[in-house]
Every structure is written in structure tokens, then in C-alpha cells.
């Protein structure tokens, strides 16, 4: 029996089908008409969402996004990327939790990479590490036993419909909630442990993929694996084309498997610690860059004949670095464990600059909240906190036992909602980084976005009170000091200013406070 899909606009044939299914009599005709109208209305509303132009850089300010007619920044604290490939993770519950917290972004791995349960990166309850035999890959299982992670080997020539049903449903459920999804197609493998679980490893498939050094997996020197990678990437891109809430990322942390030391954070450390993580700034080598360029072409060529074109993100490096050169067609520049300087050094690129992953600063919420305010008030476009409180069985984000090298909690998500609300209370598209207005802020570091002469978004990082000297034009002003933990107004004042220097006294605060300053009249 053919059931009309709600993922496309219903046809006349669908309408006739529904009437026949209702088997209406003359008496039931009115009831049938009402039910049919409800069906068509619901389906049409869904088709309208799917026909919206995909999220893009805002034409008036490319450091923010245009999404469904509004200028937006993307802020979240999301799960560890395994929502689709782990069938034991209830992503409906997860997305509902994100939506309830007022967050609008999540990152999703496309299924080509999985981790080792209770081992990889010390994550004990890892939704990117399905249990034995539970890895739901894009590829179908064969009839041959022997996959290293349990169950049968994979047949790389066949897709698994269950994966793509789950993938499309995830994108659709996120779309209903206004949540943008970064689909990460590939990832570095870091060491042999993850490579042992790869479906592309010849021991795990029936397709005789070439036996290679795993560090060559994401290079053009990977033998017949390259063709399977292209087919996989194109399939994920094609399946997602109708959705307006998708950004594609080429590869997660491409420098990790093929690093080139480019800079260090603290040059005063002694080798070898000076030159390794967490002090090194590494870039991918030339072999990696050539492969990434090819992968970007797969995305672009696959979408060329399709209705929609989506943004493409390049994961550039950890921490901060002035970008020397981006791959062709890149819209979003992703940094991990980012410093605010990742924005300031690259603002002139006129691309979205993203803090794409947090972690390795302990479990305390304060560290990640402060990172979010510092980054976004420097002109950042995206803040994506990796939240280890989302685990299988706790998809509402309430697993608060230690679980890996990062943080995450309902409290942190509430605090990030304060940041999102603060930014949305301003004319976001008119804001730009401002190094002039705050002349001095005693004992703290100041980050400022402003529409000069109109409104100012100021974040003070540290402990107060602080005396803040501002250079403001003449006018009538309202000033609200916002508690970055609760969103409450800790202090408000209105004042008339004749122009020039103006000193404001903050209230007491710990680990940061925000100031919303608006000029109401000359």
C-alpha cells in the first residue's frame, strides 16, 4: 500500500488516495473533507519548510547567518555527534531538549567514523561508540561474519536503508525545531584503535579495499578507498539536499592524522611539551589538503544539478591562527578549543568563524560559559560546546557523572541560552567588533560588539566590580548589566551624556558580566 510522503508536497493522486482510504459515504463526506484539509495543510506546511532557501551567510553581514528570514548566531551545547549512527540514542528526546533550552545548532558525524566504547579519549558513556553489533553505518551489512565491532562485515556497494531513514528523520526533526545541523562527513582516526573499527578497513568489509597505512586514509594515496569515500559523501549530500538547516563540514580535525607544526601557544615551555598538544598549533599537511580539496569538490559537484546549495565548513586548526589560505568554496572556518583571537585574526575574511568544539578544561560550567562569551563578543559566528551530559539513556542531557574530557549540563545550556538571548536582543546584523569604545575596564578583559552610536554589547571577563571608561557620542542612554549565569538584570541605569569619556561602575560579579548599552536619542 502506497502511503503519501509528508516530505514532499502532496499531489492530486495523493488526495484521491486519501479519499479512497477514508471510504467515504455521503454521510461522511464532510468529515472526510475536514480530515483531508488537515492532511493537506500539515503536509503543505512541511513542504514549505523544505522549500525554504538553505541557511547561508547573511548578505549584509557575513559573520552571521540568514536562516528563515532572520539574522542568527548559532549557539549550542550538543551531544558527541553519534545521534544517527548509534541506534540506542534517542535523538527525538535529544533534539527536544536542545529546543527547550533555546539552542539552535548541533553537530552530526555522517557515519564513516566510530569510536571504541569506554576507551576512546577516556569517554565512558560515548554515543559515538555504539555497543557490540550496534553500529548503524551508511553501508549495509553482508552475510559474512567478522566485523571488529561485532556483527557481520559491511558491503560497501550497498546502502543500509535504516541508516538513511534515521539520517533524514534526524534532519527533519531538527528542522521542525529550527536547529541547524553541521553534517561532518569524515574525521581523522587518531590511532589504530579507531581504524580497527572502520568499515573502510579491509578486515571489516567484503569489498577488498586496499590495505593502507591508516594515516593515508584521508589522502589521495588511499587506493580504491577513494572511490568509496566519494560515493559515500555524495550520497549523504544528496539525501540532505532538500533540508534548509544543513551545513556540511569536510573533515573533523584533519591535522590530527597528518600534522605540521605551525605555531605554539606558549613559546616559553621546554620541548617536547612546547611542540605537542595542548600547546601546538598544527595544520594538515599537503597530502591532507589535496584530499580535502577533492572532498569539497564532491559536495559542490553533487549539489550542482540539485535544487539547493549548502554552506561548506573547513576545520582549520586548534586554538588560533591567521588563515593563510582556505580551500575553494569554503563559507565557514572552524576552530577547536578556540581563543577569541581566532576571530580577530580572521575577521577580514568575511566568513563565518566558528568555535566548533570545546573540551579539555574540566567539568566546570564557568570555563565553557566564559569561552562562549569571549568568542561570540569578539565577533564569532558559532559556539558549539561538546556536552557529555547527553548519553544513551540520558538523551535529555542529565548524565552528570564524570564522562570524558569536557563539560556539559542543564545549567550550562541555560547559561548559553542567556548568551543567545542577549545577542538576539540587539540588531545582530549591524554589530561588528569594536576596539575603540571601551577605553579601559579595571581588572578585567573587555570584548565589545557595537553598532556605533546606536547600541553596544560588552562583555567583561573576570571578577568585579569594575570601573569601565567608555568613549560615547552625545545622547540619552540606557544601560543594563546582565548576569551571564541567570540572565537577570543585576543593575540598570539611564543617563544623559554630553559626549566623550563616560565612566560606568559595574555591580559585583564573578567570572564575567555583560553590559547592554543602547542610545535612545541624540
What spans do the regions from the language model cover?
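Intrinsic, low-complexity polybasic segments
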Residues: 9-10, 14
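Boundary at the C-terminal end of the N-terminal hydrophobic targeting segment
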Residues: 43-47
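Active-site mouth of glycoside hydrolases
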Residues: 52, 60-64, 68-330
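Bacterial N-terminal signal peptides
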Residues: 31-41
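Short, hydrophobic beta-strand segments that form beta-sheet elements in well-ordered domains
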Residues: 311-317, 332-336, 353-354, 458-459
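Catalytic-core region of carbohydrate-active enzymes that cleave or remodel glycosidic bonds
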Residues: 325-395
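Aromatic- and carboxylate-lined catalytic core of secreted/periplasmic carbohydrate-active enzymes
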Residues: 48, 368-494, 501-522
Amino acid at each position: 500500500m502506497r502511503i503519501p510522503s509528508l516530505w514532499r508536497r502532496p499531489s492530486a493522486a495523493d488526495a484521491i488516495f486519501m479519499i479512497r482510504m477514508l471510504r467515504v459515504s455521503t454521510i461522511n463526506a464532510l468529515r472526510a473533507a475536514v480530515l483531508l484539509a488537515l492532511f493537506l495543510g500539515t503536509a503543505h506546511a512541511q513542504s514549505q519548510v523544505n522549500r525554504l532557501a538553505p541557511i547561508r551567510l547573511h548578505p549584509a553581514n557575513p559573520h552571521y547567518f540568514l536562516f528563515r528570514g532572520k539574522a542568527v548566531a548559532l549557539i549550542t551545547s550538543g551531544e558527541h555527534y553519534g545521534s544517527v549512527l548509534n541506534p540506542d540514542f534517542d535523538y527525538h528526546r535529544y533534539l527536544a531538549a536542545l529546543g527547550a533550552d533555546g539552542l539552535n545548532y548541533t553537530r552530526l558525524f555522517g557515519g564513516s567514523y566510530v569510536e571504541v566504547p569506554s576507551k576512546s579519549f577516556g569517554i565512558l558513556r560515548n554515543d559515538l561508540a555504539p555497543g557490540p553489533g550496534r553500529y548503524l553505518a551508511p553501508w549495509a551489512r553482508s552475510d559474512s561474519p567478522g566485523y571488529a565491532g561485532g556483527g557481520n562485515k559491511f558491503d560497501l556497494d550497498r546502502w543500509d536503508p535504516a541508516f538513511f531513514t534515521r539520517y533524514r528523520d534526524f534532519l527533519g526533526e531538527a528542522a521542525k525545531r529550527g536547529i541547524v545541523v553541521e553534517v561532518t562527513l569524515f574525521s581523522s582516526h587518531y590511532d589504530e584503535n579507531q581504524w580497527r573499527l572502520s568499515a573502510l578497513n579491509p578486515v571489516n568489509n567484503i569489498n577488498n579495499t586496499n590495505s593502507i597505512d591508516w594515516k593515508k586514509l584521508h589522502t589521495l594515496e588511499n587506493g580504491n578507498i577513494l572511490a568509496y569515500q566519494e560515493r559515500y559523501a555524495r550520497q549523504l549530500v544528496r539525501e540532505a539536499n532538500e533540508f534548509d538547516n544543513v551545513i556540511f563540514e569536510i573533515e573533523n580535525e584533519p591535522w590530527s592524522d597528518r600534522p605540521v607544526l605551525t605555531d605554539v601557544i606558549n613559546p616559553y615551555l621546554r620541548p617536547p611539551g612546547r611542540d605537542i598538544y595542548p600547546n601546538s598549533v598544527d595544520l594538515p599537511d599537503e597530502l591532507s589538503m589535496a584530499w580535502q580539496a577533492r572532498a569539497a569538490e564532491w559536495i559542490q559537484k553533487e549539489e550542482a544539478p540539485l535544487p539547493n546549495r549548502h554552506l561548506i565548513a573547513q576545520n582549520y586548526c586548534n586554538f588560533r591562527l591567521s588563515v593563510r589560505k582556505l580551500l575553494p568554496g569554503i563559507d565557514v572556518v572552524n576552530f577547536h578549543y578556540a581563543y577569541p583571537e581566532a576571530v580577530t585574526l580572521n575577521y577580514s575574511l568575511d566568513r563565518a568563524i566558528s568555535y566548533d568544539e570545546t573540551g579539555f578544561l574540566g567539568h566546570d560550567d564557568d570555563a565553557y560559559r566564559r569561552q562562549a562569551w569571549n568568542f561570540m563578543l569578539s565577533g564569532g559566528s558559532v559556539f558549539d560546546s561538546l556536552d557529555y551530559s547527553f548519553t544513551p539513556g540520558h538523551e535529555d542531557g542529565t548524565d552528570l557523572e564524570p564522562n570524558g574530557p569536557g563539560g556539559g549540563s542543564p545549567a550550562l545550556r541555560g547559561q548559553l541560552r542567556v548568551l543567545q538571548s542577549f545577542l538576539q536582543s540587539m540588531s545582530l546584523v549591524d554589530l561588528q567588533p569594536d576596539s575603540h569604545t571601551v577605553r579601559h575596564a579595571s581588572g578585567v578583559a573587555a570584548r565589545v560588539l557595537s553598532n556605533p552610536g546606536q547600541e553596544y554589547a560588552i562583555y567583561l571577563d573576570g571578577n568585579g566590580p569594575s570601573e569601565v571608561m567608555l568613549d560615547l557620542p552625545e545622547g540619552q542612554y540606557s544601560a543594563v548589566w546582565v548576569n551571564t549565569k541567570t540572565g537577570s538584570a543585576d543593575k540598570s541605569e539611564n543617563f544623559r551624556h554630553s559626549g566623550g569619556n563616560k565612566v560606568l561602575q559595574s555591580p559585583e560579579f564573578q567570572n564575567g558580566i555583560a553590559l547592554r548599552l543602547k542610545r535612545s536619542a541624540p
